[in-house]
Amino acid sequence: MLQKVTGIVVRTVNYGESNKVVTLFTEELGKVAIMARGAKKPGSRFHASSQPFVEGVYIFPSSRGLAQLKSSDVMTSYPEIRKDVERMAYAMYWLELVDRSVEDRVQNRPLFRILQDALQALNAGMDADVITHYVELRILHLLGVAPVLTGCVRCGDVTDPMYFSVASGGFLCARHPEEGVILLSERLAKLLYLMSKHELSEFRNVPLSDESRVLLRQLFDAYMESYSGLRLKTKRVLDQMIRLHLNED
């Protein structure tokens, strides 16, 4: 019996002289690995459909083992992302984040749509940092360690000023001071709350000042390191690229 799925390539591993083991995050099955024979060869029928963050339709035998890809059809390769090295670095981080956060063959349509929406938004030119923090929040929710963004962790108060505490796992009000907290503007606190509740499309035109951008990166980097348990190579590459970009400016 053959299975037909819509999937996004989240990881590839070379196998032998010409083959690839391709890991797809699919709408129907969750994460699944398949063998794409000959995919390393530029002229092969599976070469295009086995590239990172390609979205396509894939057909392979139903099997608990490593199934062999029989047919594939590329829906989109997100060409605008591929034209820009920095955007590619963001996309690769999201792929590894999803890959490392989900188990094999556990369906998660909401997360598939989030990854799909993120790639579409990046391809359309949306702010990569806004998308990244949206994806990170959703992954933290999936892992069961999302920060409390509805009010003060201690008392539920929503009165400004609001602080963010990595140690306490979310917002803190001025009545519950703590060392190492990050002071948030009213706008940033509201943005974080809204990002935890709404679709990505709602934030398509959100402007970020340089100061806010640095603050959010600091906040999410510290929180992800403390709570996600993930140490990702693609995140280190992205951070190096961001630092290089800042030095050039």
Curated annotation (Swiss-Prot):
Highest taxon above the source species: Bacteria
GO biological process: DNA recombination; double-strand break repair
Record key words, sorted: DNA damage, DNA recombination, DNA repair
Similarity remark: Belongs to the RecO family.
One term under GO cellular component: bacterial nucleoid
Stored Pfam families: RecO_C, RecO_N
Full protein name: DNA repair protein RecO
Alphabetized SUPFAM superfamilies for the sequence: ArfGap/RecO-like zinc finger, Nucleic acid-binding proteins
Family annotation (Gene3D superfamilies): Nucleic acid-binding proteins, Recombination protein O, C-terminal domain
HAMAP family: RecO (MF_00201)
Species name: Exiguobacterium sp. (strain ATCC BAA-1283 / AT1b)
Task of the protein: Involved in DNA repair and RecF pathway recombination.
